[in-house]
């Protein structure tokens, strides 16, 4: 049976695990949190849900960092939550220190599996985790812009009437305000985006609205209910399933950007194949000149923040 370890049992982390369980991903789930009683309460609650599903062989319990040894997958959701009106990048100082401490403990445990970082800001924190542990880059990833892509597909579906599973395209770059919607590679059903523009089924104003709505939606949700967790829970469960069962599906997730590229040396989202060897970047995913410029600017902006982190924290 697979073994999955979750660090951080707040709303986001436990929603990921619960979604994995309801999807039928059989595993031994181990919950780790600084608040051990809180984690134990979640384990007890979810074990009741497991008991109602006679087809699953899953088990769930609490544990310590030592339990990471032998695990197939580590999901890191620890960190302070995003405050109302706060950008993800404004959380860097606090959560980078937390991530460094976690990474040191995980390295000490002998863990040798795959890691999905979902604590915000995910791009920077995945970089912190990989630098501290020195784990193979392809075995560390972040949830990146997978959720942004889901939101974008939802809004494009609303505008066109085409179901979301027939809307194909990605959001790349920073998981945040400088994300980049790749309209040039978009396909809606069997048609290119240009066909919808030519027929006036979509307008340039529609595309602008979709782009803005995609990155602003998180703030709207946080203003209403203080945090987001169902969307990211579903997204990360999909990633976990692809890694654990070698499905080799393509997702827009945080992967390492080579130092030779503008803003390189950090994790940032591009399309990647996820399977038993970790992530593989999708090759020949060409962008329009404007999209490439926006992506480079997004990477350079993140790199500046990463440089600031390195001034505050020794690696």
Curated annotation (Swiss-Prot):
GO cellular component terms listed in the entry, alphabetical order: cytoplasm
Top EC group: oxidoreductase
Gene Ontology MF, one: L-lactate dehydrogenase activity
GO process terms (BP): glycolytic process; lactate metabolic process
UniProt-annotated catalytic positions: 175
Subunit composition and interactions: Homotetramer.
Protein name: L-lactate dehydrogenase
Organism expressing this protein natively: Mycoplasmopsis pulmonis (strain UAB CTIP)
Phylogenetic placement of the source organism: Bacteria, Bacillati, Mycoplasmatota, Mycoplasmoidales, Metamycoplasmataceae
Gene label: ldh
